[in-house]
């Protein structure tokens, strides 16, 4: 009788505990100790979500700590600009028209800057005035040692030939190719190359030097009157030995040298000179010189 009463009371207590929600896995479903939890149970997904939230918070704290240390180590304010406004417009144009070909790393490599600078340029929507553009370009070119070039461009009123970056200075400027079609992959990254003014300023000097050399050469080819009295008669030399007998500056050999050559090759010389246009030949038809 006592055993039956105790069993009845224990059963009622277990039922009451189960109704109140305090039943445990061991009481409801007794089993061996150390068994792995059932993946189909109700509390497994909640624990999994809790772990994901904890890992996310940990990553966020780590990122915040890294940004804080970075701000402490770097200089305050925005970094100094190393690109001209023309280069910034090129970056925006290339990234907008050809985003696949000109990604952020590709632009950073092409303009010799960091990816943070490229992202700042793409994110910025600031529209400066002409004075602000010239002031910024002057700072960039002064840092690159090209301030005289900027003064020359400002004097001519042409600011479209400024160099793209202060670090890498080249003889040409890359401009977006408006004629390039985005349909053709071969021309998707076409660029128009404009020569720098530094090459053009050297061209007149080279031509001036060449013209002076030609003028001196023509003056050295004035015919010398021979003792026979003919205006076109002079002492001649063979055309085969013309180049080695000339002096270093392109003038004809001296009279003494001509006498020596005449003594060495007496049969090849003649006292008659025939002019054909600007070319002179001897009586045997051998070419002498050209004026």
Curated annotation (Swiss-Prot):
Residues 1-15 form the signal peptide. The modification Phosphoserine is found at residue 41. It is found in: Nucleus; Secreted; Mitochondrion membrane. GO terms for cellular component: extracellular region; mitochondrial membrane; nucleus. Residues 256-265 have a biased composition (Basic and acidic residues). Residues 39-49 have a biased composition (Acidic residues). GO terms for molecular function: rRNA binding. Glycans are attached at residue 158. One of its GO terms (biological process) is mitochondrial ribosome assembly. Pfam families: Neugrin. The keyword Secreted applies. Keywords: Developmental protein, Differentiation, Glycoprotein, Membrane, Mitochondrion, Nucleus, Phosphoprotein, Secreted, Signal. It comes from the Eukaryota. The keyword Glycoprotein applies. Its main location: nucleus. InterPro entries: NGRN/Rrg9. Residues 27-49, 224-270 are annotated as: Disordered. Plays an essential role in mitochondrial ribosome biogenesis. As a component of a functional protein-RNA module, consisting of RCC1L, NGRN, RPUSD3, RPUSD4, TRUB2, FASTKD2 and 16S mitochondrial ribosomal RNA (16S mt-rRNA), controls 16S mt-rRNA abundance and is required for intra-mitochondrial translation of core subunits of the oxidative phosphorylation system. Belongs to the neugrin family. Forms a regulatory protein-RNA complex, consisting of RCC1L, NGRN, RPUSD3, RPUSD4, TRUB2, FASTKD2 and 16S mt-rRNA. Interacts with 16S mt-rRNA; this interaction is direct. This is Neugrin. The lineage of its organism: Eukaryota, Metazoa, Chordata, Craniata, Vertebrata. The gene is NGRN.
């Amino acid at each position: 009788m006592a055993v039956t009463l105790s069993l009845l009371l224990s059963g009622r207590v277990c039922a009451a505990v189960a109704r109140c929600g305090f039943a445990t896995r061991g009481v409801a479903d007794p089993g061996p100790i150390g068994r792995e939890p059932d993946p189909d149970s109700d509390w497994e997904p909640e624990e999994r979500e809790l772990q994901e939230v904890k890992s996310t918070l940990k990553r966020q704290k780590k990122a915040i700590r890294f940004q804080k240390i970075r701000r402490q180590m770097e200089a305050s304010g925005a970094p100094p600009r190393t690109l001209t406004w023309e280069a910034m417009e090129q970056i925006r144009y290339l990234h907008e028209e050809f985003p696949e070909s000109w990604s952020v790393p590709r632009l950073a490599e092409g303009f010799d800057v960091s990816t943070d600078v490229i992202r700042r340029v793409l994110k910025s929507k600031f529209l400066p005035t002409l004075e602000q553009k010239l002031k910024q370009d002057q700072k960039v070119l002064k840092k690159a040692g090209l301030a005289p070039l900027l003064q020359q461009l400002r004097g001519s009123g042409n600011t479209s030939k400024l160099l793209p970056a202060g670090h890498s200075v080249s003889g040409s400027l890359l401009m977006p190719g408006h004629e390039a079609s985005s349909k053709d992959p071969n021309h998707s990254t076409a660029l128009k190359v404009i020569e720098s003014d530094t090459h053009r300023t050297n061209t007149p000097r080279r031509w001036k030097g060449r013209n002076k050399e030609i003028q001196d050469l023509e003056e050295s080819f004035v015919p010398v009157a021979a003792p026979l009295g003919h205006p076109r008669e002079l002492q001649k030399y063979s055309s085969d030995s013309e180049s080695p007998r000339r002096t270093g500056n392109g003038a004809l050999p001296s009279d003494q040298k001509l006498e020596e050559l005449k003594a060495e090759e007496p049969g090849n010389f003649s006292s008659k000179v025939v002019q054909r246009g600007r070319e002179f030949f001897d009586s045997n038809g051998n070419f002498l010189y050209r004026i």
